[in-house]
Amino acid sequence: HIRAVDAPGIAHVKLIDATPIGINVRSTVATYAGVHDELRKLFARTPEAKERGYKNGDFSYNTGRLRCPGCDGTGVVSLDVQFLPDVTIPCPDCRGSRYGRQAGEVKLVNKAGQAASLPELMDMDVTAALDFCQDRKTVRQKLETLKQLGLGYLTLGEETPNLSGGEAQRLKLASEIGRSQTDTVFVFDEPSIGLHPLDVQVLLGVFQA
């Protein structure tokens, strides 16, 4: 087995495979792709947020004060069923959105005059969110990458442990695109697994870009 290879100019080797992205239900498409952080910044700058004293961190469903108190920001609750395994259901308070009522009262307005709260955006698929955020450069670029990789149908709030192997692999690739990779070699393990031929063409286009 080769333990080390001398390759001038190469400092990193990254494996992009189809293994699941963790088991944490708090990890979503938006958080893994870096979209959620950018959205929180945008919502913290809205007039409603400033008026109420909300900061960037308040819009986190993990630790922020706008997270749902019923499920603590997980979007689900467990029911104790005697003599049977616990049953997990969507939180009845937030209906799976992970956020409390106050979060729904803070709206982001785009140039077209459309308004949406952060819970509403997290419930959109990538394509719909991209349409809404056309005038928000940092968010738009990240969403465009996801769509270019054929992930436009995934909702931003989709839990990453629920993704298929092919989806997980493309999401990992999306998280790397946009960073400086001049000294990096990527190793892909069956990148076309589970993909429709049209999606394979899209993926090849990304490789060649």
Where are these predicted regions, by residue range?
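Conserved phosphate-binding elements of NTP-dependent enzyme cores
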Residues: 1-209
